Structure formats: structure tokens, C-alpha cells
Amino acid sequence: MIEASKLRAGMTFESEGKLIRVLEASHHKPGKGNTIMRMKLRDVRTGSTFDTTYRPDEKFEQAIIETVPAQYLYKMDDTAYFMNTETYDQYEIPVVNVEQELLYILENSDVKIQFYGSEVIGVTVPTTVELTVTETQPSIKGATVTGSGKPATLETGLVVNVPDFIEAGQKLVINTAEGTYVSRA
């Protein structure tokens, strides 16, 4: 059992027969009354997200999640296909369950598949990935690193803010936890 006050982003727990992943969690102490935990959660099985509050002392059954190394194969319609790199088993995951993760991976990228028992529930991507800029505004002569930056569209469709000197065709290192530019590759 885990208390609501100990839940953090990325953790998974069971509540009312549902498997829930924490997207955001924060403590709030109103002027009057008791502390509450505000959370943005996702039902792992349906993909629906919702906001809720809990008392910090509420307890939940923490879900035991196992991971296996895998490779992203391709996406077709509403399904993403992955292959276990040890057993060569293939897994189909609804795109709605891995929508954010697909912004950071290309076909044949290495990932980790998350299992709850024998059920595939999600994908973990590396902390940083290298992606190519497909579209951005032209560089401005004399632009410096301290500028405010400009938006750049990457090969997966992800849009990140980059320094002014970045041009289309360059490979960038992207932080997957925050969705931000780190450096040129």
C-alpha cells in the first residue's frame, strides 16, 4: 500500500479496480482546512485522463510493473507495434496509450515495454533521443545562444523551442521527460 502523499509522476497504482498512472501530482494547503493532493491521472487501460484530489493519508495498492527491452516497429491506424528484443514476441499497443512516447521514437528505436502481469500497459523511452529538424524558420545572421529561440518541428512531429542558430536538417538531442532541446547531436 502507498499513501497518496507518496505518489509521484510516472507511478502506477490500483484504485476501484482501475489501473491508474500519475501524470502530475502536487500538495496543496488551502488557507483553511486540510492539505490535499491534486493529481492529473490516466486510466492505463482506456487512455482517458482526469483530474482528482485525495487526502494525503489515503492508501492505494501500488501496481507491480515489469519492463522488457523492445524495439518500436511501426504504427498503423490506431495501433503501435513493438517487438521484444529477447524473445521476438510482437505486441500491439493502442496509440492512445503511447501517444506522448511516439513523439520521441522512430521506427527501430529501442524502448522498454511495461507489463502489468501479462498485460502490456505502456512504453518507456530513453531519457534523451536524437531527432532531426524537418522545419524551422531560417537562421538570423548574428543570432546568439541567449536569444529567446524559435519553434522547430522534428521528424516525429514534435515541436520544441530551439536556439536561433538551429537549421532544418540538423540532428538535435531532446530531453524526453520535459520535451526540450538539450544540444546539437
Swiss-Prot record:
GO cellular component, one term: cytoplasm
Signal peptide: none
InterPro entries per record: Elong-fact-P_C (IPR015365), NA-bd_OB-fold (IPR012340), Rib_uL2_dom2 (IPR014722), Transl_elong_fac_P/YeiP (IPR020599), Transl_elong_KOW-like (IPR013185), Transl_elong_P/YeiP_cen (IPR001059), Transl_elong_P/YeiP_CS (IPR013852), Transl_elongation_fac_P (IPR011768)
Keyword Electron transport listed: no
PROSITE patterns, A to Z: EFP
Entry GO MF terms: translation elongation factor activity
Pfam families in alphabetical order: EFP, EFP_N, Elong-fact-P_C
Main location: cytoplasm
Keyword list, A-Z: Cytoplasm, Elongation factor, Protein biosynthesis
Pathway(s) per entry: Protein biosynthesis; polypeptide chain elongation
BP-aspect Gene Ontology terms: peptide biosynthetic process
Subcellular location as annotated: Cytoplasm
Role, per record: Involved in peptide bond synthesis. Stimulates efficient translation and peptide-bond synthesis on native or reconstituted 70S ribosomes in vitro. Probably functions indirectly by altering the affinity of the ribosome for aminoacyl-tRNA, thus increasing their reactivity as acceptors for peptidyl transferase.
Family: Belongs to the elongation factor P family.
NCBIfam families xrefs: efp (TIGR00038), PRK00529.1 (NF001810)
Protein name (record): Elongation factor P
Organism: Streptococcus uberis (strain ATCC BAA-854 / 0140J)
